Amino acid sequence: MERREFLAALGTAATISSASQVFAQTGGGSPQKVNVALYVALEAKPGKEEAVAEFLRQGRALVEAEPATIVWFGIRLGPSSFAIFDAFPDDAGRQAHLAGKVAAALMAKAGDLLAQPPSIKKADVLASKLPG
């Protein structure tokens, strides 16, 4: 492929990408846009690393009851560093999650488990690849 053809193809792909919406399939099969997210950084107190990991594992069950939480990840970044990443169709879904059971449980246990308060950052989803 010549450079000119490559650049034309790249421009077409960029146009399609920017015109497309990101969709996730919900349990009912109806698509939902994923537009906003949260990134929550967590630093475990010394000796509480496995308790934080277990909290995140158990948190998944609580999130299952939140229809507007399209994706939710509890991740370990290092020996004592963890994070939660989740995405929502809109700010109402994000606010519902922040008022939900996982957030309440995290705040209730933060003093015991975390070296510092959770760092909660709101984000806009620019692009993603989701199953479905």
List PLM regions with ranges.
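C-terminal segment of N-terminal export signals and the immediately downstream linker at the start
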Residues: 20-39
